Amino acid sequence: MAPQRSQDKTPIQLLHEYGIKISSAPKYELIHADGDAHQPSFMFSVTIGEVTCKGRGSTKKAAKHEAAEAALKLLKRDSQIIDQRDNNGLSPEAGEASNPVGILQELAMQRVWCLPEYVVFMETGPGHMKEFTIACRLEGLEETGSGSSKKLARRAAAENMIAKLQSLSGSSEITWSPPSRVYVESLRNSTGEKVSLLKRTPLSLPNTDYIQMLLEISLELGFQVTYIDIDELTVNGQYQCLVELSTRPVTVCHGSGVTSSNAHNAAAHNALQYIKMVASKH
């Protein structure tokens, strides 16, 4: 089956949705870039399944659109068109607006999520050829988008976030839900077995696997644990990292050690000390 070309979706969006349905995501590749600074020209190829098409444009996004458009035409010619007016799981009005930023905002409000946050991630190029990269953050997810203006970059980031949500949902209808929210204050009232054990356990015992201990507590309470390695060594030449707990507010603790693994264990130890302190308060 081939994707329906509806007026409220871009060729890139339609091809992405079709890729989800056939379990083969479109892959874009920059073939070459030429021209001068005032008239650049880019050529991209897109491959989906056994189909490969090319597109040319004055921007990378335009070239990708042309490639996706060519792939859609080829798929349409070879297959019967299936109507896809699902509007990303939102109301018809939201889909028809073709405004990714507005669609994402409405989705967050409907699901009672935190509203999307947009942060300028990078700014490159001379004054007349600026390119902005903006990160869109939503419920623990992050996607970036680029454009010749902040508005276009923000739109691209929102578009990519919607595509990410569709991918996590396994279809063009967004059914994904963020992990349950665990508020730091709620730790005081926890009666879980692992938390109760933590309250009674000294955190100064040698050769303790604090990483495993933190994992068990996170599974009991329902928050996620993410370790972030820091490239720079400490002044003493030790590895260092951060551990982030998806609590509300987010909890971040630092750790360092003679190896990366030791740094992770130290960060987990510090996070456990914090959890123990909060859980023991009355």
From Swiss-Prot:
Subunit structure: Homodimer. Interacts with dicer1 and eif2ak2/pkr. Also able to interact with dsRNA.
This protein's record includes keyword Repeat: yes
InterPro entries listed in its UniProt record: dsRBD_dom, Ig-like_dom, RLC_Component, Staufen_C
PROSITE patterns documented for this protein: DS_RBD, IG_LIKE
RNA-binding listed as a keyword: yes
Name of the protein: Interferon-inducible double-stranded RNA-dependent protein kinase activator A homolog
Family statement drawn from the similarity comment of this UniProt entry: Belongs to the PRKRA family.
One Gene Ontology term, aspect cellular component: cytoplasm
Keyword list, A-Z: Cytoplasm, Repeat, RNA-binding, RNA-mediated gene silencing
Gene Ontology annotations of biological process type: regulation of regulatory ncRNA processing; siRNA processing
All copies of domain DRBM, residue ranges: 10-77, 99-167, 209-277
Task of the protein: Activates eif2ak2/pkr in the absence of double-stranded RNA (dsRNA), leading to phosphorylation of eif2s1/efi2-alpha and inhibition of translation and induction of apoptosis. Required for siRNA production by dicer1 and for subsequent siRNA-mediated post-transcriptional gene silencing. Does not seem to be required for processing of pre-miRNA to miRNA by dicer1.
Subcellular compartments: Cytoplasm, Perinuclear region
Alphabetized Pfam families for the sequence: dsrm, Staufen_C
Molecular function GO labels: double-stranded RNA binding; siRNA binding
Gene for this chain: prkra
Domain of life the protein comes from: Eukaryota
Annotated organism of origin: Danio rerio (Zebrafish)
Family annotation (CDD domains): DSRM_PRKRA-like_rpt1, DSRM_PRKRA-like_rpt2
